[in-house]
Amino acid sequence: MTQKLHIKTWGCQMNEYDSSKMADLLNSTHGLELTEIPEEADVLLLNTCSIREKAQEKVFHQLGRWKELKKHKPGLVIGVGGCVASQEGEHIRTRAPYVDIIFGPQTLHRLPEMINQIRGGKSSVVDVSFPEIEKFDRLPEPRAEGPTAFVSIMEGCNKYCSFCVVPYTRGEEVSRPVDDVLFEIAQLAEQGVREVNLLGQNVNAYRGATHDDGICTFAELLRLVAAIDGIDRLRFTTSHPIEFTDDIIDVYRDTPELVSFLHLPVQSGSDRVLSMMKRNHTALEYKSIIRKLRAVRPEIQISSDFIVGFPGETAEDFEQTMNLIAQVNFDMSFSFIYSARPGTPAADMPDDVTEEEKKQRLYVLQQRINNQAAQFSRAMLGTEQRVLVEGPSKKDLMELTGRTETNRIVNFVGTPDMIGKFVDIKITDVFTNSLRGEVVRTEEQMGLRVVQSPQMVINRTRKEDELGVGRYHA
């Protein structure tokens, strides 16, 4: 009888990527098949996030539910991974002794061995170490699930912003070798992936080793990925302003596959608050990056992250943030009320902004950006938008749905052969959370750029072992 695996994932796109790799890995080593129903599972994994307030309590609340399942199924293996696991380590078992495995973001590749140890009679396994990039060397070949895919190109962060736990939970910056990244993307392209989103906590700090002991910059990697035939849309998440160099901006000038949409976190528009956050840039420097980008891509739209109510933030500081929002004209944001993360420098600062004031500032900020986003959507009425078709529409199964470069959902009447391809759509209706349009051009009529086929990339890359790690042939 086939054994089942249930993974519950909280947090960022990196966690989503990690969870997909856990599923592929355990399917290849143990034959575990994913299930959405925890009660069916033989292995339960909780992939955690420590960014938001009360993250630890959320974990123990979920584990309490799973404890009841283990009472009725003694052989059930329960594992906790992700950033809370990295932060709390063995302490998790102090409060939840029924947890069998505790692993960090950098040790998920050791899950098969950990499960074997538990099933072999070991009471628990805890491994929250930071073995650099080793995890990517032990993962199975990627499996495409639709026309879009995430590919992790680096781990960790060296910036040590005063409010952030990432350097402590995911370690410092380590980049994957460029050939490994290209090999994974070429494999995905062979399976029909058309859009790739490059992932990293500070993705534009990428410095990947090359086959000849050189270093590939992030700008160079973007061009290499865009040159793979079939990859006709390229994104990346998340970047830091101090690493957003002119060579990256130049890629926007000459690489049409790179979308006209950028998520570039700023957190605050006040230089005083940015200094307390240890962001190491000013609001003016941030705006300078946006000006340069719009000089080469006038249509580019920008999203960002904001924290309101940071310790010491005054009404004037918040007003400077609102001024920045108006000047940059952000299309969307991920905005949050500040909450102290244990172990970070900001946690020792006096939290002197009232809860009521924090909520009010968040409301004002989100209303402003929502209004700006609505204006962008209305401006799309009557325009042609290139859409990557994802599948049937959730609103009407007789229609298809896809996304624009700016991640807007578009519903339209089409044919099944369009799924997984690009179509040009004339926008005829604008709604709060989606657009509607009519097909004006199919992919066959577009003349998309072909530079090198995925098989060319794969052919010049040899496998170093059976798990799909490759390097260039000289």
Swiss-Prot record:
<comment type="similarity">
    <text>Belongs to the methylthiotransferase family. MiaB subfamily.</text>
</comment>
<keyword id="KW-0949">S-adenosyl-L-methionine</keyword>
<feature type="domain" description="TRAM">
    <location>
        <begin position="378"/>
        <end position="441"/>
    </location>
</feature>
<protein>
    <recommendedName>
        <fullName>tRNA-2-methylthio-N(6)-dimethylallyladenosine synthase</fullName>
        <ecNumber>2.8.4.3</ecNumber>
    </recommendedName>
</protein>
<keyword id="KW-0819">tRNA processing</keyword>
<dbReference type="Pfam" id="PF00919">
    <property type="entry name" value="UPF0004"/>
</dbReference>
<dbReference type="Pfam" id="PF04055">
    <property type="entry name" value="Radical_SAM"/>
</dbReference>
<comment type="subunit">
    <text>Monomer.</text>
</comment>
<dbReference type="GO" id="GO:0005829">
    <property type="term" value="C:cytosol"/>
</dbReference>
<dbReference type="InterPro" id="IPR002792">
    <property type="entry name" value="TRAM_dom"/>
</dbReference>
<dbReference type="InterPro" id="IPR006638">
    <property type="entry name" value="Elp3/MiaA/NifB-like_rSAM"/>
</dbReference>
<dbReference type="GO" id="GO:0046872">
    <property type="term" value="F:metal ion binding"/>
</dbReference>
<keyword id="KW-0808">Transferase</keyword>
<feature type="binding site">
    <location>
        <position position="157"/>
    </location>
    <ligand>
        <name>[4Fe-4S] cluster 2</name>
    </ligand>
</feature>
<dbReference type="InterPro" id="IPR023404">
    <property type="entry name" value="rSAM_horseshoe"/>
</dbReference>
<dbReference type="InterPro" id="IPR013848">
    <property type="entry name" value="Methylthiotransferase_N"/>
</dbReference>
<dbReference type="InterPro" id="IPR007197">
    <property type="entry name" value="rSAM"/>
</dbReference>
<feature type="binding site">
    <location>
        <position position="12"/>
    </location>
    <ligand>
        <name>[4Fe-4S] cluster 1</name>
    </ligand>
</feature>
<keyword id="KW-0479">Metal-binding</keyword>
<dbReference type="GO" id="GO:0035597">
    <property type="term" value="F:N6-isopentenyladenosine methylthiotransferase activity"/>
</dbReference>
<feature type="binding site">
    <location>
        <position position="83"/>
    </location>
    <ligand>
        <name>[4Fe-4S] cluster 1</name>
    </ligand>
</feature>
<feature type="binding site">
    <location>
        <position position="164"/>
    </location>
    <ligand>
        <name>[4Fe-4S] cluster 2</name>
    </ligand>
</feature>
<keyword id="KW-0411">Iron-sulfur</keyword>
<feature type="domain" description="MTTase N-terminal">
    <location>
        <begin position="3"/>
        <end position="120"/>
    </location>
</feature>
<dbReference type="InterPro" id="IPR038135">
    <property type="entry name" value="Methylthiotransferase_N_sf"/>
</dbReference>
<dbReference type="InterPro" id="IPR006463">
    <property type="entry name" value="MiaB_methiolase"/>
</dbReference>
<dbReference type="Pfam" id="PF01938">
    <property type="entry name" value="TRAM"/>
</dbReference>
<keyword id="KW-0004">4Fe-4S</keyword>
<keyword id="KW-0408">Iron</keyword>
<feature type="binding site">
    <location>
        <position position="161"/>
    </location>
    <ligand>
        <name>[4Fe-4S] cluster 2</name>
    </ligand>
</feature>
<feature type="binding site">
    <location>
        <position position="49"/>
    </location>
    <ligand>
        <name>[4Fe-4S] cluster 1</name>
    </ligand>
</feature>
<comment type="function">
    <text>Catalyzes the methylthiolation of N6-(dimethylallyl)adenosine (i(6)A), leading to the formation of 2-methylthio-N6-(dimethylallyl)adenosine (ms(2)i(6)A) at position 37 in tRNAs that read codons beginning with uridine.</text>
</comment>
<dbReference type="InterPro" id="IPR005839">
    <property type="entry name" value="Methylthiotransferase"/>
</dbReference>
<dbReference type="InterPro" id="IPR020612">
    <property type="entry name" value="Methylthiotransferase_CS"/>
</dbReference>
<dbReference type="GO" id="GO:0051539">
    <property type="term" value="F:4 iron, 4 sulfur cluster binding"/>
</dbReference>
<feature type="domain" description="Radical SAM core">
    <location>
        <begin position="143"/>
        <end position="375"/>
    </location>
</feature>
<keyword id="KW-0963">Cytoplasm</keyword>
